[in-house]
């Protein structure tokens, strides 16, 4: 991948692993676990709002690369950049402020709807494994009946 003139930025480990696997399956690009952990080709921002602190890395250290930015279109309960349109606007406004044009953005899960990489993964699960989600959904329903209990994050389900 070192000869490909792109660098990828994403929100978290799940996104990073998904993108690594996608590149391997569809483009035969191998990224080792070590390179993934060291953010060599796919930069794990750890949070969408940390993108705004990446100016030096994106426009100076990676000036010869095109930046591909993958962010979740979280709902309004999760973030102030809620939804597809606000996520696109957030990235475009930031890149405009930096006067940076060598980028593209893809909003997960499908570049049109609100959601996360976990929503995408849930929708593409092998039908043989659907029983696991049915069981998990019952578990969440049971927990939701008691307000003193916390329902696990969707990342736990996936």
PLM features: what roles do these ranges have?
Residues 3, 20-38, 48-158:
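C-terminal accessory helical subdomains adjacent to catalytic cores in phosphodiester-
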Residues 6-17:
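Catalytic nucleophile-elbow at a beta strand-turn-alpha helix junction centered on a G-D-S/GDSL motif
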Residues 44-46:
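Short glycine-rich substrate-engagement loop in P-loop NTPases that contacts/grips substrate
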């Amino acid at each position: 991948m070192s000869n490909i003139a792109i660098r990828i930025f994403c929100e978290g480990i799940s996104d990073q692993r998904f993108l690594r696997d996608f590149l391997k399956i569809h483009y035969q690009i191998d990224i080792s676990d070590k390179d993934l952990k060291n953010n060599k080709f796919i930069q794990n921002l750890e949070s969408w709002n940390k993108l705004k602190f990446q100016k030096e890395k994106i426009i100076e250290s990676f000036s010869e690369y095109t930046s591909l930015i993958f962010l979740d279109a979280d709902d309004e309960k999760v973030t102030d950049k809620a939804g597809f349109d606000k996520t696109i606007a957030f990235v475009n406004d930031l890149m405009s402020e930096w006067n940076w044009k060598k980028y593209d953005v893809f909003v997960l899960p499908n570049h049109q709807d609100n959601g996360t990489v976990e929503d995408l993964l849930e929708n593409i699960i092998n039908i043989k494994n659907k029983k696991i989600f049915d069981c998990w959904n019952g578990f969440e329903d049971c927990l939701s009946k008691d307000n003193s209990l916390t329902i696990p994050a969707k990342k736990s389900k996936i």
